[in-house]
Regions:
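Core beta-strand-centered patch of the WYL/Sm-like small regulatory domain
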Residues: 2-125
Length: 125
């Protein structure tokens, strides 16, 4: 019997594949990060000099370590350690983004959502 990924422990490889696919397909995800629920749009997946996987993402909902994300209508750009993500799954909803400074999250980039403009499910809307 297959158990849904969200109902069991996910490996780092499974989470990497899900986050990478979400970036390529411009799909939002939900995940726990250090035990707090986050709603994220992963934009860049890569690793830093020590080889630690990182996700540069736009957090548009959920919690932060300091409490709920402010209800200002906008989100926050985050650089998250992939190894700290758990219970990750794609969710239905619009791809969210806003202008940002050049990312310094990952030194070696594996995937950048900007390289896949045709994947936007909103067709640029």
């Amino acid at each position: 019997m297959n158990v849904p990924a969200s109902a069991r422990e996910q490996s780092t490889d499974e989470i990497y594949r899900l986050v990478r696919a979400a970036a390529v397909q411009h799909r939002p995800i939900t995940a726990l990060y250090d035990g707090t629920r986050r709603l994220l749009c992963p934009h860049v997946v890569g690793y830093n000099r020590p080889g630690d996987w990182r996700v540069f993402c736009y957090q548009y909902g959920g919690e932060t370590k300091d409490g709920p994300l402010p209800v200002s209508g906008g989100g926050i750009w985050r650089c998250l350690a992939l190894i700290k993500l758990s219970s990750a799954e794609c969710v239905t909803g619009p791809w969210r983004t806003e202008p940002h400074a050049p990312q310094r999250c990952g030194e070696h980039i594996e995937v950048d959502a900007d390289d896949y403009p045709g994947a936007d499910p909103q067709n640029g809307q």
